[in-house]
Regions:
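A recognition module on extended beta-rich or small alphabeta surfaces enriched in W/G with H and D/E
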Residues: 173-178, 184-241
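A surface-exposed partner-binding patch
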Residues: 1-190, 199
Length: 241
């Protein structure tokens, strides 16, 4: 059975060239490292209280993603704060598979006041997704693939950047690919996107899947339901805590 310690976390991250300092308790964090208050609180929380506290931090979006809430309740191990070599901070969400394979989802600091409704893209995102980016994490994905969760804003692109289509194929998509935004990737080259013409507010009906092996078509889907389903399938083999 794998050891769940700061040393073990750091060693696993280093296997993928991610180096830095890891802390599992807030008392170990140096005074000059400015860690979000909610993250500090998580480090000192009993396992039984983790799900409730994370649900508050993820308010809104966690109700859209019941598989994530179940993951927090049943499979998430002790969270930790990582300070990368460049000084950037992340919140580590560890879990194990077969009790000896340590894995992480990584959450980046929330955007807070760095965004405003004056930004057209920001206004176009679903309300609960905006809340997530602003209050919980600017991206929360499986490491190192940067997949299976909402991508950081800076890693999202218009679908145009993924396409190599003829003009006729582009017209057949039925939507300007500049207005289709990649929000979530499944690690296999496929993207869950938002049609920005209809994504503000609830966002459910604005979901589109772009399959890399069928690049000239977009599949209309329920945005939140697909995100939840893809995540649920991905972590189904994770060990129970």
């Amino acid at each position: 059975m794998i050891e769940l310690s700061a040393t073990a976390y750091a060693a696993e991250l280093q296997r993928f060239k991610l180096r830095g300092r890891v802390w599992l308790a807030s008392k170990d964090i140096p005074a000059d490292v400015q860690v979000p208050t909610a993250w500090r609180a998580l480090l000192d929380m009993r396992d039984a209280a983790l799900e409730t506290s994370l649900a508050k931090m993820w308010a809104g979006v966690v109700d859209r993603l019941p598989a994530v809430r179940q993951f927090f309740d049943e499979k998430l191990r002790r969270p930790a704060v990582l300070q990368k070599e460049n000084g950037d901070l992340c919140l580590l969400y560890p879990y194990t598979v077969d009790h000896d394979d340590l894995n992480f989802f990584i959450g980046h600091p929330p955007l807070g006041d760095l965004v405003s409704d004056d930004m057209p893209l920001w206004r176009a995102l679903p309300d609960d997704l905006r809340s997530f980016y602003q209050l919980a994490h600017n991206g929360w994905t499986f490491f190192p693939a940067n997949s299976m969760g909402p991508l950081p804003i800076g890693d999202q692109t218009a679908l145009t950047a993924k396409l190599d289509l003829t003009p006729d194929e582009t017209r057949a998509l039925g939507v300007n690919p500049d207005l289709v935004w990649t929000v979530f990737q499944n690690g296999g080259g496929d993207y869950l996107c938002l049609d920005l013409r209809d994504s503000a507010g609830d966002g459910s009906a604005a979901g589109r899947i772009w399959w890399h092996d069928n690049p000239a078509e977009l599949e209309p889907v329920d945005f939140w339901a697909v995100m939840n389903a893809w995540f649920e399938i991905f972590v189904e083999d994770a060990d129970r805590r």
